Amino acid sequence: MRAGPGPTVTLALVLAVSWAMELKPTAPPIFTGRPFVVAWDVPTQDCGPRLKVPLDLNAFDVQASPNEGFVNQNITIFYRDRLGLYPRFDSAGRSVHGGVPQNVSLWAHRKMLQKRVEHYIRTQESAGLAVIDWEDWRPVWVRNWQDKDVYRRLSRQLVASRHPDWPPDRIVKQAQYEFEFAAQQFMLETLRYVKAVRPRHLWGFYLFPDCYNHDYVQNWESYTGRCPDVEVARNDQLAWLWAESTALFPSVYLDETLASSRHGRNFVSFRVQEALRVARTHHANHALPVYVFTRPTYSRRLTGLSEMDLISTIGESAALGAAGVILWGDAGYTTSTETCQYLKDYLTRLLVPYVVNVSWATQYCSRAQCHGHGRCVRRNPSASTFLHLSTNSFRLVPGHAPGEPQLRPVGELSWADIDHLQTHFRCQCYLGWSGEQCQWDHRQAAGGASEAWAGSHLTSLLALAALAFTWTL
């Protein structure tokens, strides 16, 4: 009898199969065609006209504002009072729309959904991102801790009022069932309805999935950033939500405690990795696009992220294979001339140069490695390798003529650049394309005919290497 494969071979095979499964095709870019989008969703519209501090935001693929008065934007955030009849308790402890999902009329909720969606997204034809930001309660019962325990208490009271003779453990079990069932129905009905009304938008819930890896405060010395196993399992309980979503919107807001530390990168990396795991696990033939919410400053402070933390947030998200990042901010960014001037200086000095670098590096990798039909994904998620323009090959130069971008990269591809990309990154193809370099076009295949070949990878590399590649916006 022949000996079977050794443990090393078996492990390698398992890892290879696992990694191949991870790289399901995903949705193509919906805005500029870039594989990695950087969006500015900060209410800075008053800096120029009101406070006389104009901001140059042309480096961002999308510019939007989360403020109430803005409609028909490429990114629309539906806060709790902007979409349907979201049940909750207000800050005074008063019940709103029944308090818990068990008390909501889905019929009345759907009726209000249509009115609000049509107000904020006024045409069916436009494509964009639609983010539902409901944070008062969580659909998994056990996650409603601390101030969210009010939703469990009311759920228990509802059951106890109907069954006063039941023992406490039975009341808790029934309350959990009723709450989770109603929460699931409420969220699913919401997604199904809004997708039908605005089908060209990508819909999902903000902060889903979460990783619950905030234990750096208690365990700084031993902090790894990993998502607790129990929270990964609880995310899998939400398979019904991932199956109905068309995009995922995790959050990686950095507390100043994590500033310029390895823990900051670990915090972000595992949150994004968990979102990407969920994105590829719950759909048979494709992976959901992941758009990562971050802030240009640290949480609760108007202090711009350091260069190290821009790499740990924007750079890490790009290298892991996210579809983009959304830089979000609130009204605190534009309270005075001083805050606007601080943002202007920070944009010019650090943020815009880094955004331009990463935006073009991801596009460059997509063209060189994936024929422009996919995005580059780090082979080893834990590696310290990023999609940055090589300083030996490219430089950023300012635009001078009217209408020119603030910065543009100029340079040419080198063999060292090609080798670096091939060694550290591989392709995740867009839907309709396959192959190691996304060279097979399935969109043109019909009736068993062989797929169209998008071109030899080696030929494209030789051509790129031969060209003096000048990047212009």
From Swiss-Prot:
Tissue-by-tissue expression: Widely expressed (at protein level).
Mutagenesis / variant outcome for changing A64T: In MCCS; uncertain significance
Pfam families given in the database record: Glyco_hydro_56 (PF01630)
PROSITE patterns for the chain: EGF_1, EGF_2
Proregion positions: 449-473
Enzyme Commission no: 3.2.1.35
GPI-anchor amidated glycine lipid modification positions: G448
Family membership noted in the UniProt record: Belongs to the glycosyl hydrolase 56 family.
Name this polypeptide is given: Hyaluronidase-2
Organism: Homo sapiens (Human)
Lineage per the UniProt record: Eukaryota, Metazoa, Chordata, Craniata, Vertebrata
Gene name in the database record: HYAL2
